[in-house]
Swiss-Prot record:
It comes from the Eukaryota. Interacts with Orco. Complexes exist early in the endomembrane system in olfactory sensory neurons (OSNs), coupling these complexes to the conserved ciliary trafficking pathway. This is Putative odorant receptor 69a, isoform A. One of its GO terms (molecular function) is odorant binding. Its main location: membrane. Belongs to the insect chemoreceptor superfamily. Heteromeric odorant receptor channel (TC 1.A.69) family. Or49a subfamily. Odorant receptor which mediates acceptance or avoidance behavior, depending on its substrates. The odorant receptor repertoire encodes a large collection of odor stimuli that vary widely in identity, intensity, and duration. May form a complex with Orco to form odorant-sensing units, providing sensitive and prolonged odorant signaling and calcium permeability. The atypical heteromeric and topological design of the odorant receptors appears to be an insect-specific solution for odor recognition, making the OR/Orco complex an attractive target for the development of highly selective insect repellents to disrupt olfactory-mediated host-seeking behaviors of insect disease vectors. Odor-evoked OR currents are independent of known G-protein-coupled second messenger pathways. The chain crosses the membrane at residues 40-60, 77-97, 140-160, 190-210, 270-290, 305-325, 366-386. Keywords: Cell membrane, Membrane, Olfaction, Receptor, Sensory transduction, Transducer, Transmembrane, Transmembrane helix. Residues 61-76, 161-189, 291-304, 387-393 are extracellular. It comes from Drosophila melanogaster. It is a multi-pass membrane protein.
Length: 393
């Protein structure tokens, strides 16, 4: 088992995002040809995302802000904010993954080089492989179901209105977006509007899958190495010949894992920040939209609410898992039989213990930690915003 065995769902996400899959020195598969059709779909999807972000704001400026009743104004504002955040966070993933592609491939190459090949009894490779693949599979299926539901909802609503004569055809797209052509009352215009949002969300969801699965993969790789270091420290006997060399190797390996964690933090900083801000606003505004809008719109924004809750939770959960895994090194070093070693051995172990005193933690631009505590604070603040906005009705 090697690192490339973990790449199944990341490769599927890359295929959906219409970008080449990640390749590094040592990966057995050759780089696949990046077809011009994929480039066209990627560029078209990115343009559609940018247009949708702009169109949502223009639609609200031309229509939503003109509402005379407070309840209608709040509903239009919440609908605009939730749609804007959904598209904006997706575009942030496109930007972060595209601009950091070389750094990601370099990081994957380093992880490939240090992937356990010897002394496998200290590394639970199969355990962490199964956990990572299970989570990535669930995420992939969830985003695919969400994508199909989100983009098919306008067609189902239109079909329902067509079959029931008491309803007028609303021609409502996935989001309230301004288009430079006629949408309401035009089958062609409506189809083009739905298709443009569908293409944009196709690329956006693909990048979201890549982002989430990359964070999952990198998290469990760090956990694997922290767990391996802890296991080797517990089993290390200072009386055994060569113990000093083994300990020095573990100290160097621990230092390298900390550096790799910093690289992950630097690469994903923009993702962490956009998810924190976007999820806080979107969870609040989606909840308001569910409360104030009609049933069909409520179901649509409920799916967006669930997506943001899960999206932010996965990121914060992975950050907590890295912190907990790094915290195992200190007790493992302490329970080593250091008291039977010589002075040099004790000093070396003390250096490792001092370095591992504070568990490693990802931070969003060195400010908010990426943890479940931050996730709960996000939900709390979103609820406070929700009660404030809800009271305006």
């Amino acid at each position: 088992m090697q690192l490339h065995d973990h790449m199944k769902y990341i490769d599927l996400g890359c295929k959906m995002a219409c970008i080449p899959r990640y390749q590094w020195k040592g990966r057995p598969t050759e780089r696949q040809f990046y077809a011009s059709e994929q480039r066209i779909v990627f560029l078209l999807g990115t343009i559609c995302q940018i247009f949708q972000i702009t169109g949502v704001l223009i639609y609200w400026y031309c229509n939503g802000r003109l509402a005379t009743e407070t309840g209608t104004f709040v509903a239009q504002l919440s609908e605009m904010c939730s749609s804007f955040c959904l598209t904006f966070v997706g575009f942030c993933n496109v930007y972060a993954i595209s601009t950091n592609r070389n750094q990601i491939e370099t990081l994957l190459e380093e992880l490939h080089q240090i992937y356990p090949r010897y002394r496998k009894n200290h590394y639970r490779c199969q355990h962490y492989f199964d956990m990572a693949m299970t989570i990535m599979r669930i995420e992939f299926l969830f985003y695919m179901i969400l994508y199909v539901y989100y983009n098919s909802a306008p067609l189902w609503v239109l079909l329902w209105e067509h079959l029931h004569e008491e309803y007028d055809l609303s021609f409502k797209t996935q989001t309230n977006t301004w288009f430079p052509w006629k949408v309401h009352g035009s089958a062609l215009g409506f189809g083009m509007a739905v298709l443009s949002i569908t293409v944009g969300s196709f690329v956006g969801v693909g990048f979201s899958i890549v982002t989430q699965n990359l964070i999952c993969l990198l998290t469990f790789q760090l956990k694997l190495h922290y767990d391996g270091i802890s296991s080797q420290l517990v089993s290390l006997d200072c009386r055994r010949p060569g113990a000093h060399k083994e300990l020095s190797i573990l100290i160097a390996h621990h230092s390298r894992i900390l550096q790799l964690g910093d690289q992950v933090n630097d690469i994903m900083n923009f993702v962490f920040g956009s998810s924190l801000v976007g999820a806080t606003i979107a969870i609040c505004m989606s909840s308001v939209s569910i409360m104030l809008l009609d049933l069909a719109s409520a179901f649509k924004y409920a799916s967006g609410l669930v997506a943001f809750v899960l999206y932010n939770f996965v990121i914060c959960y992975m950050g907590t898992e890295v912190t907990l895994a790094s915290g195992k090194v200190l007790p493992a070093a302490f329970y080593n039989n250091w008291y039977e070693g010589d002075l040099v051995y004790r000093r070396m172990l003390l250096i490792l213990m001092m370095r591992a005193t504070k568990p490693y933690m990802w931070k969003t631009y060195k400010l908010a930690p990426v943890s479940i505590t931050t996730y709960m604070a996000t939900l709390k603040f979103s609820y406070q915003m929700f009660t404030c906005v809800r009271s305006l009705k």
